[in-house]
Curated annotation (Swiss-Prot):
Record-given protein name: Polyunsaturated fatty acid lipoxygenase ALOX8
Positions contributing to Ca(2+) 1 binding: 15, 17, 86-87
Cell compartment(s), UniProt: Cytoplasm, Cytosol; Membrane
Organism: Mus musculus
Gene: Alox8
Tissue: Expressed in epidermis and brain. No expression found in heart, spleen, liver, skeletal muscle, kidney or testis.
GO terms (BP aspect): arachidonate metabolic process; cannabinoid biosynthetic process; endocannabinoid signaling pathway; linoleic acid metabolic process; lipid oxidation; lipoxin A4 biosynthetic process; lipoxygenase pathway; negative regulation of cell cycle
Cross-referenced InterPro entries: LipOase (IPR000907), LipOase_C (IPR013819), LipOase_C_sf (IPR036226), LipOase_CS (IPR020834), LipOase_Fe_BS (IPR020833), LipOase_mml (IPR001885), PLAT/LH2_dom (IPR001024), PLAT/LH2_dom_sf (IPR036392)
Pfam families per record: Lipoxygenase (PF00305), PLAT (PF01477)
Lipoxygenase domain sequence ranges: 126-677
Required cofactor names: Fe cation
Binding-site residues for Fe cation, renumbered to this chain: 374, 379, 554, 677
Amino acid sequence: MAKCRVRVSTGEACGAGTWDKVSVSIVGTHGESPLVPLDHLGKEFSAGAEEDFEVTLPQDVGTVLMLRVHKAPPEVSLPLMSFRSDAWFCRWFELEWLPGAALHFPCYQWLEGAGELVLREGAAKVSWQDHHPTLQDQRQKELESRQKMYSWKTYIEGWPRCLDHETVKDLDLNIKYSAMKNAKLFFKAHSAYTELKVKGLLDRTGLWRSLREMRRLFNFRKTPAAEYVFAHWQEDAFFASQFLNGINPVLIRRCHSLPNNFPVTDEMVAPVLGPGTSLQAELEKGSLFLVDHGILSGVHTNILNGKPQFSAAPMTLLHQSSGSGPLLPIAIQLKQTPGPDNPIFLPSDDTWDWLLAKTWVRNSEFYIHEAVTHLLHAHLIPEVFALATLRQLPRCHPLFKLLIPHIRYTLHINTLARELLVAPGKLIDKSTGLGTGGFSDLIKRNMEQLNYSVLCLPEDIRARGVEDIPGYYYRDDGMQIWGAIKSFVSEIVSIYYPSDTSVQDDQELQAWVREIFSEGFLGRESSGMPSLLDTREALVQYITMVIFTCSAKHAAVSSGQFDSCVWMPNLPPTMQLPPPTSKGQARPESFIATLPAVNSSSYHIIALWLLSAEPGDQRPLGHYPDEHFTEDAPRRSVAAFQRKLIQISKGIRERNRGLALPYTYLDPPLIENSVSI
């Protein structure tokens, strides 16, 4: 006979408790005990409860290997319960044979209906560390089960592959939004839709009467940053600053030679550059920068309210004056092929010509941001990381424990996006000039160009030559966060991988990397994505990239959407007239006629309001309430990571006090651990 204390912790979320009966059996090196019911007087397993149970085992099972948890309905059905599956969220189990000698079994899973969970003691183990056949068999069975539950599908040819579920109703509770998060998202969507519907804006297919009328819509859920955008959107300095610190801060690059198809001359830009210099001198000095939206050339366009929509493929040349002067646009060409019907617009042109040219650039920024930077890089690729993690890494694996907080809710939000945003006839088709067809074109085109280095911030900054451009807060804050993540990951890797050989010998890790390469990057070797990792250094870089992409990168390109776009002329989602082919034609009336119709603008506002802020149940970067790591060494690393993020946040907030428009999107407490909205 053997006696032990079993302590059980139930989650605090709404619906986490259960009326079902829970039993456990203990698996050890000498065998497995019979199922032992966990019950006492009163109700067990209420939400938020931690409960102790004294159990007696008929035999000694030897060294404990696993805990088998069994849940079944009560023998006597309770009123109103017989028609539903009673789910239970278990946080952890603890076994104590002697006082002070407890074994901890992390769980942090939902168990729906009648079923069974197998839990291992919390110490993380790489596959080559498991020598007992029972543990080896458990790892394999766990992965086989998850690979059946979470399978791949091709949603659109040429896109990264994704989860093979049609709707969020099909998802199991372990990858689904919490009840609170779901309710808040629904309330947000419903309130936004109702307000705009009552105002009649969703049914108006015509033009806005004036910018002043747009201003009245702008009163919808204002923010301080959005107010700043409204006040400064026409200014050249603000236009340029958005390439650095707006929602698409990843395109600008230093220009050392002008493209052949962008024939800017000294005469054109002399009024901006001033005396005593030239284009060639500024190119050699490194003070010119280029933003090229050429990927949009010839892209599919949409039809809205029965009218064809239009897109441009502009190139924008910007100049950084010496000293502390602002970055300014000095030339814009709206199409890729130069010619008499493709003028180069200049700041010295008529006010409305120049404003219209800048607005076409902003429309192109919107398309590339939403389709490529946001949807592809910050949603579809993180979904690949999430799905491969669930399919190839068992829960006891140190990299599963490290990554699971960073894939929370990603499969839910992406499944919801395929239902409500990118499906034919949904929000993207209702509000944007490219529609789902154009978005699909852009994603396919970028997938053919996408390189591993683009996903690694330090390499991307170097490749674009923007290491020293002043006022680039996305770079400054992002590099600090990248460094903090890399230091944290390096410590975790050093704990579990003593050598490069140990990385090479981890077959679960290698299967994970191969699956990301084959399913996410479609086996394209030119992407530079690894299909195997053979050193600790390569592993640290790869995991840092994954965590940064799922957290900071997503925050940088997602959190500011409402701020930047709610004043629609700053980032119009469509253009109703073609790009101008000559100068001197733009007027206030033609500017308004080019902008989106009222209903398209309004549907766009609904999408922005939904996608810009987390609807509750948030977990900021480095906040890990689910304690998957139980050993002292990784817990110390987590604490050090959290302290570093606090220091970074203090520095960002101190800097922001001196800025007219604070850059907050990479302040660590405002970064979500995962792609969850």
